[in-house]
A protein has these predicted regions:
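Bacterial N-terminal signal peptides
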Residues: 8-19
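A bilobed periplasmic-binding-protein/Venus flytrap-type ligand-binding module shared by bacterial periplasmic
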Residues: 122-130, 245-262, 279-283
Length: 336
């Protein structure tokens, strides 16, 4: 798995995985996903294909497409024939409804937990020994600290990163938005390069050796340590972070056109199964089934988490205020 992860780091951002299953497959699916779910879905796809074969006798081939969540959503809107999408945040799937009408408006109500079979959060990955003594978000705003994070215009994970830092400062200063914006501006003044997706930023930090601290998906941080060496990196858990809820959905019009609705729906539902939840936990995603929450409880650090609705009023409002053209990110980054 270590070799596979290193190879994935060097791969292109939008790559189709080799099909799973025999060449004479009865049905194929395309799962369009965000950047760091590659290893998760390699294992999950194998498990689902075996489950489906045992249940129906049919062979299912699952192909994967990965990249920054915003770019992935736009690819589906522009015609990429995804049977299902498993993206980093709800806004990008809302856009598939709003701009292409490929899914219903109420897509998020169709599966449990607002269609999020697993959750995650944002942590800080530093080099072994933590030479810059990073302890919390405020250390990222100090002069002389090089911070790696992707571009929130294209990456879903980067938007979670941005809001996690903003939310930390809001909680610290009693809700002053101007102080929060200035705090986040200082962090982005320390960012030397904005990659288009989370895996690209992992490559920048882990493989290229750029930066003192990487604002990272929790699962990506664990993967970097466990696959590339606990002697090279360590995780710093901030005092406050955001509960990230990556959602999934059937792409109705594509699935109906390709006559894959039944298997595509079963594929998503299997993410909530015992096997699906166990695979999520093994890949450092936080399961939502209480049985597997308990099983993997010792794996995950205790984090003081807030929800996007709590501080930002949900994704539609957050996107408009922070990441749309002229929003706070543009204001911050134009001053760099």
């Amino acid at each position: 798995m270590k070799h596979a992860f290193k190879s994935a780091l060097l791969a292109g951002a939008l790559a189709l995985a080799l099909p799973l299953g025999a060449s004479a497959a009865d049905v194929s699916l395309l799962n369009v996903s965000y950047d760091p779910t590659r290893e998760l879905y390699v294992d999950f796809n194998k498990a689902f294909a075996a489950h489906w074969k045992a249940k129906t006798g049919d062979t299912v081939t699952i192909k994967q497409s990965h990249g920054g969540a915003g770019k992935q959503a736009r690819a589906v809107i522009d015609g990429l024939q995804a049977d299902v999408v498993t993206l980093a945040l709800a806004y990008d799937i809302d856009e598939i409804h709003a701009k292409a009408k490929l899914i219903p408006r109420d897509w998020q109500a169709r599966l449990p937990n607002n269609s999020s079979p697993y959750t995650s959060t944002i942590v800080l990955l530093v080099r072994k020994g933590n030479p810059k003594k990073i302890k919390d978000w405020d250390d990222l705003a100090k002069p002389g600290v090089s911070v790696i994070t992707p571009n929130p215009k294209t990456s879903g994970g980067a938007r979670w990163n941005y809001l996690a830092a903003w939310g930390y400062e809001l909680k610290r200063n009693g809700g002053d938005q101007k102080k929060a914006q200035e705090f986040v501006r200082k962090i982005y003044a320390n960012v030397p390069v904005l990659d288009s997706g989370a895996r690209g930023s992992t490559t920048t930090f882990v493989e290229r050796g750029i930066g003192d601290v990487f604002i990272s998906w929790e699962n990506e941080a664990f993967l970097s340590i466990n696959e590339l060496g606990a002697d090279k990196f360590e995780i710093v858990v901030p005092s406050v972070s955001i509960l990230a809820e990556p959602p999934v959905t059937l792409v109705d019009k594509v699935a109906d056109k390709r006559k894959t609705r039944t298997v595509a729906q079963a594929y998503l539902e299997y993410l909530y199964s015992d096997e699906g939840q166990d695979i999520a936990g093994k890949h450092y995603y936080r399961p939502t089934n209480p049985k597997y929450v308990e099983k993997y409880a010792q794996q995950f650090p205790k984090v003081n988490l807030f929800k996007i609705d709590e501080l930002f009023g949900g994704w539609q409002k957050a996107q408009k205020e922070h990441f749309a053209d002229g929003g706070t990110f543009d204001q911050i980054y134009s001053k760099k």
